[in-house]
């Protein structure tokens, strides 16, 4: 059963088309990746799901309901959390204050928010040590953990991850890799877009290749890892 189904999605910025007739499915409990070059349109795809683009056509169906025309503030209320590229933490607020913002739809349940923070700290122990520290003073990797944890505070049904490894040190990339595996094992459905093809194919069950705004390949991640076109274009093999 598909939790998210995108069909014939076309999107543009002003008069510049970015996505062309894109279709994909994310099954309930699945881990799907979209890989491609830096200008392929991957981030635009997630922005469409989050309701952040106006010039779109096609259909985006979440749990049986078309959400293409919903305003952005309605998307998190449905259980869709988006970790954007660039982290976008609130620098003057503490780590814990940033996390609490992610749980705003449950803001009247203080006990649930506390449990949510504890779960994030279990996933990223480093954040527990820095919970009273201003987020703007953290390293890039730690800020990525805050952005990731803030999304999890929503208790989402679908997690959208936009280039979570971008600009991070190899050790932090390994931590993010393990975190993605752990939260997927807990039952969370994930749609990941990632330029690091090797990372994406190592964690996702199924993947799509986006090239110049169009889907050109799809299949089980293991099969794509062995596909000569993917190996040459994206894995440097």
Question: Which functions belong to the PLM regions below?
Answer:
Residues 58-66, 78, 112-117:
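Conserved ABC transporter NBD signature motif
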Residues 35-37:
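The feature captures the beta-strand-to-loop junction immediately N-terminal to the Walker
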Residues 134-138:
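Conserved ABC ATPase signature
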């Amino acid at each position: 059963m598909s939790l998210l189904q995108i069909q014939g999605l076309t999107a543009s910025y002003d008069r510049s088309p970015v996505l062309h007739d894109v279709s994909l499915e994310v099954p309930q409990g699945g881990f799907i990746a979209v890989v491609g070059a830096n200008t392929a349109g991957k981030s635009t795809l997630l922005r469409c799901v989050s309701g952040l683009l106006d010039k779109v056509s096609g259909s985006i169906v979440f749990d049986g309901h078309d959400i293409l025309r919903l305003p952005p503030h309605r998307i998190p209320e449905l259980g869709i959390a988006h970790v954007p590229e660039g982290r976008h933490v609130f620098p003057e607020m503490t780590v814990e204050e940033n996390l609490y913002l992610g749980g705003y739809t449950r803001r009247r349940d203080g006990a649930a928010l506390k449990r949510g923070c504890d779960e994030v700290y279990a996933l990223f122990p480093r954040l527990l040590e820095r919970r009273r520290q201003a987020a703007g003073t953290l390293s890039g990797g730690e800020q990525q953990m805050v952005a990731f944890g803030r999304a999890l505070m929503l208790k989402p049904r679908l997690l959208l991850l936009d280039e979570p490894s971008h600009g991070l040190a190899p050790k932090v990339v390994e931590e993010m890799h393990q975190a993605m595996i752990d939260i997927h094992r807990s039952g969370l459905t994930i749609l990941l877009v990632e330029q690091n093809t090797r990372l994406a194919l190592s964690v996702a069950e199924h993947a799509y290749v986006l090239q110049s705004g169009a889907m050109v390949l799809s299949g089980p991640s293991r099969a794509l890892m062995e596909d000569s076109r993917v190996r040459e274009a994206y894995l440097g093999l």
